[in-house]
């Protein structure tokens, strides 16, 4: 593509993302499906704004590459070792069973045994990008279904390598000694990457970090990710696997969090571009010509993979509440199918219309997953919330609660227990289905659902409740719920959990007066006890704690971020901190002159 055409395409991608994704979110069909529909609209079979789909699809695979790097950063070799049984046990079983059934189905049509074999293996692969994105949206990455799903995806990434090597053999291409020599060189280069990454990358980042220039650190992070991907592609291996390994090698380094922050914005945009390009690749001409055959193929693909995954979840004793999510989120075809099928077509293993038919089937199966996950959410909500009610009724009981608590993790549990101990009527909403099932077994009335959905809040009684307490892990979810409540339930008193000062500032800017920084109070309490152990009288330590809390809150409000630049903001922070330290010292000096009337035992 020429530079002007590339710039035009970039602007077009940003425009459709900005327009389509919010509309999709408002319609409740999810961001991923919004990207796919946007891709269909601007692609060669839609409005025709973009023609060179293959080049864009190849470039957009970098979204998956960045995603796998960040996932690698979140693991370490020890944690990966603990997943070995699920990777090579459940992962291998999923690929083997799915490939056997789907390949057999292809063989019963007009596919040869060679094309049926490679077709079955390709269809057995799931979309790493889509599955991981949906897992994060649904909060599955924190429970058993998410961990097992990740293990299956990782095995699929590994399985692509021998599958690609199998294609020339199926095509009848004879190898020679030179082929084995090249394979040996690739293995040696791969081992060299592992050793170099282990012993050279960390000192390199230490040298770069010492410069203190953030832009150079970001450039180095991009160089590491893109360099690893390019190196693995040159070896004929998976780019995503290479960056995943690079992430694991740095998972225990002191630069892990900085790397994650540097890469995150690129990952999000490129993943969106990947889904748009998948939508553009959908051949509507083939779909129109063979619509019945393709629809049956999509149905069989999703049903077979879903059934295999559900069976594996059951024999691995996964909680009943998580099996459907596990089966649904991996039920689609994946991006590696494009690679496998294109390679097979180049060796003439796939012939005629077999390639476009398979590609359209995979693309449509990817479009079914967001909708399927919504159906599963509804099924789980009805199963684990209200029992034996007509379908038209809401799936959360409106008990006319005084308080709605969003999130039932450790933070939300403490709040809920305190409220229930004081006979308050509460409704608890939780998105993690395993937590809902577990807490209901202990007698807690917890409902499954995503509180960022307006109808769920309305069903839970938000229009009648006096307060809502938001304890979400994700700050973006907290802010979305805050905006929903302010817009649709203005009489609802909002109380929220803030993970730190940044989230606290965001809440203050939206007008939320009551919030708690999750580590602030416990840190103050431990600080007070430390003062007592150092010899300060318990009364003075308590007063010091109270003064510090009040003054820190004052500083938090005074230092609200303004559009004055980083240097001005830093200057304001330093000046305010000095001023508040002076005030604190004067107030504590007055406190020391007051008589002490109680000691530590009076608490």
Curated annotation (Swiss-Prot):
Gene3D superfamilies: 1.20.1530.20, NAD(P)-binding Rossmann-like Domain (3.40.50.720)
Keywords: Antiport, Cell inner membrane, Cell membrane, Ion transport, Membrane, Potassium, Potassium transport, Transmembrane, Transmembrane helix, Transport
Molecular-function GO terms, alphabetical: glutathione-regulated potassium exporter activity
UniProt source species: Pectobacterium atrosepticum (strain SCRI 1043 / ATCC BAA-672)
Protein family according to the UniProt entry: Belongs to the monovalent cation:proton antiporter 2 (CPA2) transporter (TC 2.A.37) family. KefB subfamily.
Domain RCK N-terminal: from-to ranges: 400-521
Protein role: Pore-forming subunit of a potassium efflux system that confers protection against electrophiles. Catalyzes K(+)/H(+) antiport.
Database matches in InterPro entries: Cation/H_exchanger_TM, K/H_exchanger, K_H_efflux_KefB, Na+/solute_symporter_sf, NAD(P)-bd_dom_sf, RCK_N
Any one biological process term the GO annotation gives: proton transmembrane transport
Transmembrane stretches, start-end: 5-25, 29-49, 53-73, 87-107, 115-135, 152-172, 180-202, 207-227, 230-250, 268-288, 291-311, 326-346, 356-376
Oligomeric form and interacting partners: Interacts with the regulatory subunit KefG.
Protein name (record): Glutathione-regulated potassium-efflux system protein KefB
Tree of life domain: Bacteria
Keyword rRNA processing listed: no
Keyword Transmembrane helix included in the entry's annotation: yes
Main location: membrane
NCBIfam families: 2a37, PRK03659.1
Subcellular location(s) per record: Cell inner membrane
